[in-house]
Structure formats: C-alpha cells, structure tokens
C-alpha cells in the first residue's frame, strides 16, 4: 500500500521571521541589514522602524551620513514589503533625498498609513509627499517634528494626491499662521476629521478661527492648535 507522505506543517509568522537565513524556506539569504528590516514587520502589514538602533547589531553604520539614502534604497526594492500597508519610519534622519528614492518604489503600492515623524524632511520633503502617486491611498499622515514651514504646508494643502487623508499630525513643525490658513482653505483636505497643529507658531486669532470655522473642513471633529 502506498502511503501519502505527511504534509509539511505551515509555519506561523513568528517561526518565519526566526527561520535562520532562509526565512521560511523561501531561499532568500537576507543580509543582516535586510534581516533587521524584515524583523521590524509587525502583524504582517506594518513596517515599524522607530529609530536607527534597530541596525546596531547588523554591521550597518546608522551614523553614516548616507544612512537615510541606504535605508530608502533598500526599502524601495525589498520584495517582502509589497504587502505592507502601514509605513512607520521615525528617528532615522530621513530627508528629502531619501524620500525621492522611496516614492519611486515599485514595491510600496499599498501604503494607507504613513508616519515619517522626527526626521529631516523640511519643506522639500513635504512637497515630495504631497506630489507622490505612491501615497494616493494614505488616510493617516504623521509628519511631526520635521522642520516643515509654510511652503511645505501649502504643498500638502494643495496636494492632488493626498485627498483621502482623514488624520493629519504636524506637531512641532513651523507651519505658522500662513500654513494654518492654507489648510483652512484646502479643498483637498476636506476629509480631515483630526488635525493636530500643536507647537507650530500659529499665533493669530484669525488663523485659529479660520481653522475652527473653515467651510472646507466640514468633517473636522478634533482640532488641536497652539
């Protein structure tokens, strides 16, 4: 009598990420740098790299001035990230140059939650976010602590791409009255339900009132501005 060989037991997610260098018999020999990123995937669809200490034991020098470029280049082409929907990269000195590489990725097409807080994007980086087709699905956008001023804020407010955003956090930037007024007058951010502009030098009562009474932001339920 022929006996069917027992089927191979499928591995769970935790077993996969701890499966040596082959990661679930996929035959992929990840570099230590790639392994650190792979192990930063949470719940299969969330990439969470909250600081550069993730890479301390990999041999990759996160203090290198080119670290943001190297990280962006790897993420943009790293096949396991094709199912990622939430992208969280904070405290990694991510700048506009790195962001240009990231938004050209053919892999990261499903991002709907984007957190790039505590980096070095500046106005140029904000403009790249605003113009990137990669982010058309984003509903939650966190760009706190990035040195973004009125020009970058205007780019976000007039973006033809970020029309699905319902939650926007710009905490501790340099939005100012000018940037706040741009958001208040935004047609493209009309779906906002939550807006945090704390620590943004929004001083004038005119700007604050414009946000509170904006005929554009009719869905807004939570506004924090100080």
Task: Give, region by region, the residue ranges found by the protein language model.
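Short, solvent-exposed loop/turn at the beta-strand->alpha-helix junction
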Residues: 54-56, 61-73, 93-100, 120-127, ...
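Leucine-rich repeat
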Residues: 33-44, 73-82, 101-109, 128-136, ...
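Conserved hydrophobic beta-strand positions in leucine-rich repeat
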Residues: 47-49, 87-89, 114-116, 138-143, ...
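LRR N-terminal entry segment and analogous cap-like coil->beta motifs
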Residues: 6-113, 117-120
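Short, positively charged, low-complexity/disordered linker segments
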Residues: 171-193
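Alpha-helical solenoid scaffolds in eukaryotic macromolecular assemblies
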Residues: 2, 82, 221-223
């Amino acid at each position: 009598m022929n006996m069917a060989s027992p089927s191979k037991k499928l591995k769970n997610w935790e077993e996969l990420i701890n499966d040596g260098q082959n990661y679930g018999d996929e035959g992929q020999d990840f570099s230590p740098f790639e392994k650190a990123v792979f192990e930063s995937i949470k719940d299969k669809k969330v990439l969470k790299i909250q600081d550069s200490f993730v890479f301390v034991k990999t041999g990759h020098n996160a203090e290198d001035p080119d670290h943001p470029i190297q990280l962006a280049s790897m993420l943009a082409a790293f096949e396991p990230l094709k199912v990622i929907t939430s992208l969280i990269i904070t405290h990694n000195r991510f700048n506009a140059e790195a962001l240009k590489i990231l938004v050209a990725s053919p892999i990261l097409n499903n991002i709907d939650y984007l957190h790039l807080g505590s980096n070095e994007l500046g106005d140029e980086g904000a403009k790249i976010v605003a113009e990137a087709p990669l982010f058309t699905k984003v509903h939650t956008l966190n760009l706190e602590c990035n040195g973004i001023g009125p020009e970058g804020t205007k780019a976000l407010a007039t973006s033809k791409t970020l029309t699905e955003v319902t939650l926007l956090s710009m905490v501790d930037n340099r939005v100012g009255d000018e940037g706040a007024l741009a958001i208040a007058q935004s047609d493209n951010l009309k779906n906002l339900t939550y807006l945090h502009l704390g620590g943004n030098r929004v001083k004038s009562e005119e700007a604050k009132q414009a946000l509170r009474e904006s005929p554009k932001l009719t869905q807004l339920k939570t506004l924090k501005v100080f």
